[in-house]
Amino acid sequence: MTSSTRTASPVSTDFDFLVGEWDVTNRRRTDFLDEASEWEEFPAVSHGTRHFDGGANFDEIEFPTKGFAGLTLRLFDRETRLWALHWADRRTGRLFPPVVGGFEDGRGEFYGDDTHEGKPVRVRFIWSGITADSAHWEQAFSVDDGGTWVTNWHMDLTRR
């Protein structure tokens, strides 16, 4: 199924699992576009909240060993039934272009366009392995409009 046909559930409870406090184990590539680059691991702590009767979700994440923090604002479009995920971080002070998509069979896929080090990239976020006490997120970039993907960041979340 393509990102254009993927839809969110009829009720906007998709991101309710993120509400609360989480310990996060990060694993990301040292070069986001090179699938042969080394992985680095580091911790984070995240706090998620629900807003607009489930139509919005917000989380703040602190990366204590990296010296930065970020936030994600997720907004549910009741007309299109899709989520738009907006990321910002303290390093840049900039709101990155959103990734858009939804959940199907417990897996969320979200796509968007951005640049990385001056190169245009297609961006994919995947949420999977969602339980009451854990979840997995991953990010991938494509430089060939989705023909191939380099998964460059994993987060494993464990509820505090």
Model-derived features with residue positions:
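Hydrophobic small-molecule pocket/channel-lining residues, especially in calycin-type beta-barrels
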Residues: M1-R160
